[in-house]
Amino acid sequence: MIRPSADVKGIVNIPCETFSGSIDSNTDVMQAVAGCDIVIHAACITEQWGVSFAAYERANFTATQYITAACMAHHVEKFIYVSTANTIGPGSKNNPGNELNGFTLFNANSGYINSKYLAQQYVLEQVAARKLPGIVVNPTFMIGPNDVKPSSGQLILYGLQHRLLFYPPGGKNFVHIRDVCQGIIRAIERGRTGDCYLLAGQNLSYGEFFRLLKRISGKRQLMVKIPAFVLKAAGIIGSLAGTGSKLNYSTAYMLCLDNYYTGKKSERELQLRYTPVEAAISGALDWFKENNYF
């Protein structure tokens, strides 16, 4: 299902049937789901700035309500909801977040995270109350080729474009995009209805990530760590300046956070094997270079 205004460069070579419509249109969703045995819901607004909560709610929550209703109306066999790791509480490197952790990131005041959490809870409620054949996958920060927009690949491009590289004090879990795709397939084949599965690769601080990027790319850079209090102060100023600021309190909070997870449950139950993050970075670098992003 593709909205009429979508940029489809990233999928032109995929042999698939497409349906033109919008996920926030109940009529479009009902028509798109008709005749499907399995539905994968991966669409959402992921931008962390310049978006009102009403827009997040419409695309991330209300659309999920429409899609689950359509799945039940058309008696689909399986529904895979692609959520985010941040609906699950993160942890440290020594004790990373797992599927038993509750939601703890409400303090981040992120419209994206909050709307995804509400949508995930709605899916799980429909599983319990109305027998929706739903399974949730929770990918971490995805890296790899074919990032047309780019989305998460902006972090790599940022690391390539600066001789003096300022980086935040926190860290996160990085996962190869192909491992996430494989995780979705395995969830269809092996996942248990009503369960959540973190799709989580390797935990790295931002300093470790950029040093790895520096080594793989061969770039010569001076790296400077930004103190947390400086970043958070700048984030507060950005929030006061309005929704257009790329750095607001929510993004600053997340950049300072130890945002670490484990994918052991998906390794055990979905039989996933995670690719080293070096391969994900190398694949992204090669693709960006071939397509003239740098």
Please tell me what each predicted stretch does.
Residues 65-111:
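Conserved Rossmann-fold NAD(P)-dependent oxidoreductase catalytic core, especially the SDR/UDP-sugar
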Residues 183-246, 263, 268, 276-294:
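Mid/C-terminal beta-alpha module of Rossmann-like enzyme folds, strongest
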Residues 118, 150-151, 168-189, 195:
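Substrate-positioning beta->alpha
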Residues 107-135:
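Active-site Tyr-X1-5-Lys
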Residues 5-10, 16-62, 70:
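NAD(P)H-binding glycine-rich loop region in Rossmannoid oxidoreductase-like domains
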Residues 105-107, 157-175, 179:
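A conserved pocket-lining segment of Rossmann-fold NAD(P)-dependent short-chain dehydrogenase/reductase
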Residues 87-89, 111, 132-154:
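Flexible, glycine-rich beta-alpha linker
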